[in-house]
């Protein structure tokens, strides 16, 4: 990192919940704490159920395990710090800690998006090219897809962190967000390169997300076309049910992201902006294990079976 950044600003203030009345914060803290704990527990239960149920040792559930890991790490990077700030009057974060939070949040966030693409591709191959499924979705092939997803997320996280923290911050050190968010940091930057860097950051942030969304949409166009060719209603329903949980998570993932990043800034108060930012950082990870466990019959049965097995072992 260049020395000028350290000489101008050595720490940032996360404004986040500072504007909220103190009476509201304990209730919000309890709500977000419960959602955070449920997110961790839900994803761990999913991973444990897949690990113990040999019938679920398939590519689709391997990708789901990788997705659960990315969600746990994404949540751990953001939520504990947010909860700590809600009950503290000292909401400063050091320059290095801010850079680390930016890197890891974007790494795990983009890894999550890439894994959703991989899961969509898995469903496309299973439904549209079933005869080639085992060849295309071998253990080595699945491992490569997961590795590429993590590598892609890490590359984007590293690129954004390097770009942002090579800027000069000299206007203010107050970040109007609950975390070190890239666009909130750009507002604090000054210098001749800021406008150019802003355009570059937008391209780096938006292009992969649009690419992922387009790939998922194309996958489902082919999937729906293949399902409509199935003669029986029961067959169509059974085939589509294998995609329902993934499609729902994609809609939630991109739906909340669109609401946050495409909304008009002038229409919302600081309270609303802060609460809306938590929909993507807290609420979306909270919903994901619920959707997968409720809308996936095999996984739901595996979780129930694992629960009964543990209860029986403890009662003996």
From Swiss-Prot:
Keywords: Cell membrane, Disulfide bond, G-protein coupled receptor, Glycoprotein, Membrane, Olfaction, Receptor, Sensory transduction, Transducer, Transmembrane, Transmembrane helix. Glycans are attached at residue 5. Disulfide bonds join 98-190. It holds the Pfam family 7tm_4. Its main location: membrane. Residues 1-26, 79-100, 166-207, 263-273 are extracellular. GO terms for molecular function: G protein-coupled receptor activity; olfactory receptor activity. It is found in: Cell membrane. Residues 48-57, 122-144, 229-241, 295-316 are cytoplasmic. GO terms for biological process: G protein-coupled receptor signaling pathway; sensory perception of smell. The chain crosses the membrane at residues 27-47, 58-78, 101-121, 145-165, 208-228, 242-262, 274-294. It is a multi-pass membrane protein. PROSITE patterns: G_PROTEIN_RECEP_F1_2 (PS50262). It comes from the Eukaryota. GO terms for cellular component: membrane; plasma membrane. Odorant receptor. Belongs to the G-protein coupled receptor 1 family. This is Olfactory receptor 10H28. It comes from Mus musculus.
């Amino acid at each position: 990192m260049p020395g000028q950044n350290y000489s101008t600003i050595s720490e940032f203030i996360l404004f986040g919940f500072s504007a909220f009345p103190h009476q509201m914060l304990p209730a919000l803290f309890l709500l977000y704490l419960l959602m955070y704990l449920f997110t961790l527990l839900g994803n761990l239960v999913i991973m444990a159920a897949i690990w113990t149920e040999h019938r679920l040792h398939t590519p689709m559930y391997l990708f789901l395990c990788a997705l659960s890991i990315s969600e746990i790490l994404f949540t751990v990077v953001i939520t504990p710090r947010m909860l700590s700030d809600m009950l503290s009057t000292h909401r400063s974060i050091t320059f290095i800690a801010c850079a680390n939070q930016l890197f890891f949040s974007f790494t795990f966030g983009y890894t999550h998006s890439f894994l959703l693409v991989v899961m969509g591709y898995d469903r496309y191959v299973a439904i549209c090219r079933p005869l080639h499924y085992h060849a295309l979705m071998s253990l080595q092939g699945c491992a490569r897809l997961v590795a590429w997803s993590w590598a892609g997320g890490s590359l984007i996280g590293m690129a954004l962190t390097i770009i942002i923290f090579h800027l000069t911050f000299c206007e203010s050190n107050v970040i109007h967000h609950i975390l070190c968010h890239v666009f909130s940091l750009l507002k604090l930057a000054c210098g001749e390169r800021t406008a150019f860097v802003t355009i570059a950051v937008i391209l780096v942030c938006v292009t992969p997300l649009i690419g992922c969304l387009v790939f998922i949409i194309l996958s489902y166009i082919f999937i729906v076309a293949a399902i409509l060719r199935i003669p029986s209603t029961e067959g169509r329903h059974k085939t589509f049910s294998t995609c329902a949980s993934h499609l729902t998570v994609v809609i939630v993932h991109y739906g909340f992201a669109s609401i946050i990043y495409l909304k008009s800034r002038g229409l919302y108060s600081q309270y609303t902006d802060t609460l809306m930012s938590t929909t993507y950082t807290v609420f979306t990870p909270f919903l994901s294990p619920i959707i997968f466990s409720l809308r996936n019959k095999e996984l739901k049965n595996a979780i129930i079976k694992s629960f009964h097995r543990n209860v029986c072992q403890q009662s003996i």
